[in-house]
Amino acid sequence: MTKDIRTGDLVLCKVGSFPPWPAVVFPQRLLRNDVYRKRKSNCVAVCFFNDPTYYWEQPSRLKELDQDSIHNFILEHSKNANQRELVNAYKEAKNFDDFNVFLQEKFEEENRLSDLKAFEKSEGSKIVAGEDPFVGRTKVVNKRKKNSISIKEDPEDNQKSNEEESKPNIKPSKKKRPTANSGGKSNSGNKKKVKLDYSRRVEISQLFRRRIQRNLIQRETPPTEHEIKETHELLNRIYENSDTKRPFFDLKALRESKLHKLLKAIVNDPDLGEFHPLCKEILLSWADLITELKKEKLQALPTP
């Protein structure tokens, strides 16, 4: 980009072999800790549309994205099934008109809405577009941010911490992921478990999401051996309950918990490679559900 780049600007960002993808320039001080840790000099942070990931890039490598370009791309590629995800990203960019609303939706998606409200309260106003994208965190903001992650990751966490420990039927299985020889026996036990807890599937899905997110994403230091082990156990439990005649993690559970978006974020983090194979298998088993959720999201977007 040749012009002075600012937060809230729509841009095209190319990553590796992927086609240029619609994104918005994001304020550094509002980034998640795991993203901010990867901060690069002379780079700005962008947040992709229709994708949970962020990327650090030099402004000179970003291309300005205007509404005419968005309209023309959608018109030209809307019927191309091979570019459905990219077209959906352009559609989200087309409906982008209020940076603060975008931030609220993003923070809610990442279960950090309380953090955004804390930022705005400390600054005395809503976060708006047009800021310098190179400005990082101050020590005061960073300290408060660290405390909000370690003490109050989710508004419901403190209320449910004791409750979580008293739920033996939610506690992750000690069994490893089923193998070809033991799969039948393992699945039989899981079917009974799903039947018993099916009415609480949304609550349990949210619990799984919070635990995995706390272990791997919302943290300042590398996960401990215990947290890695617990995450493997949780993912195995999800895997075991994702391929049944009556899926435990159904459309309602994923819609409310956004567990699939968390797994996508893990897959997109190269530092979490040991979890990638299982996350990919789970996401593959949820492919139809994820497609349905995307359709719901598109239908909810305002028509031009």
Curated annotation (Swiss-Prot):
What keywords are annotated for this sequence in UniProt?
Answer: Cytoplasm, Nucleus
Question: From what superkingdom does this record's organism come?
Answer: Eukaryota
Protein name in the entry: NuA3 HAT complex component PDP3
The UniProt entry, under SMART domains, shows: PWWP
Coiled-coil boundaries: none
Query: Please, what other remarks does the record include?
Result: Present with 2610 molecules/cell in log phase SD medium.
Q: What is the lineage of its organism?
A: Eukaryota, Fungi, Dikarya, Ascomycota, Saccharomycotina
What is the UniProt domain comment for this protein? The PWWP domain mediates the binding to H3K36me3.
Q: Which gene encodes it?
A: PDP3
What Pfam families is this protein classified in?
Answer: PWWP (PF00855)
- Subcellular compartments: Nucleus; Cytoplasm
Q: Where is the PWWP domain?
A: 7-68
Q: Which organism is it from?
A: Saccharomyces cerevisiae (strain ATCC 204508 / S288c)
- Could you tell me which InterPro entries the record lists for this protein? IOC4-like_PWWP, PWWP_dom
